[in-house]
């Protein structure tokens, strides 16, 4: 039996997150429904990341076993795109070894967060965090350096996350990609739940001048969620790429 991986994008607006759950629309649920229509049997998938409701993906990766050996990667891609809803698109497919699990094989996950400081555009409201105040990008860049490396990220986790809070952030870049559009790029091997959005929320406080860049270091060292700023909204976040 062959095993395939797929890289795919999705608009997270109308999904209750990535992970399959009963009675709600999820990305994994739609993916497995499409596979069941193709193969006429239940196919289970393993994903590289579990995005929250409203979060988008440019390069999510999932893997699954294929019960029909004669199919090639291009057949998998075409069949899935013919059966998936319009807010999910498979960009490529490839054959992988039998024990390939993208969640554990991933060496780097790259997230992008978009902040617009322009006048609100109703057509982009589900894809950027509209923020009516100007942000000091240089101060945000200084603050971001305190978060790079291996740290206890308890201050930036979701309150009920029981996982080991020690994580390594390889790099954080803050870029003006267009006039009044800021991209915050966060790279690491793995992240706690809501960790990227909590980091963004705190960096924005620095950008507003409400916190000094050094305040981020104190928040990190406090290891307390109460010390950090509020969570940035989900619709500005994208799982941009997963590297193996």
Curated annotation (Swiss-Prot):
Enzyme kind, highest EC tier: isomerase
SUPFAM superfamilies per UniProt: Pseudouridine synthase (SSF55120)
Entry function: Formation of pseudouridine at positions 38, 39 and 40 in the anticodon stem and loop of transfer RNAs.
GO molecular function: RNA binding; tRNA pseudouridine(38-40) synthase activity
Active site residues according to the UniProt entry: 52
Alphabetic keyword roster: Isomerase, tRNA processing
Binding site for substrate: 111
Keyword flag Iron-sulfur: no
Name the UniProt record assigns to this protein: tRNA pseudouridine synthase A
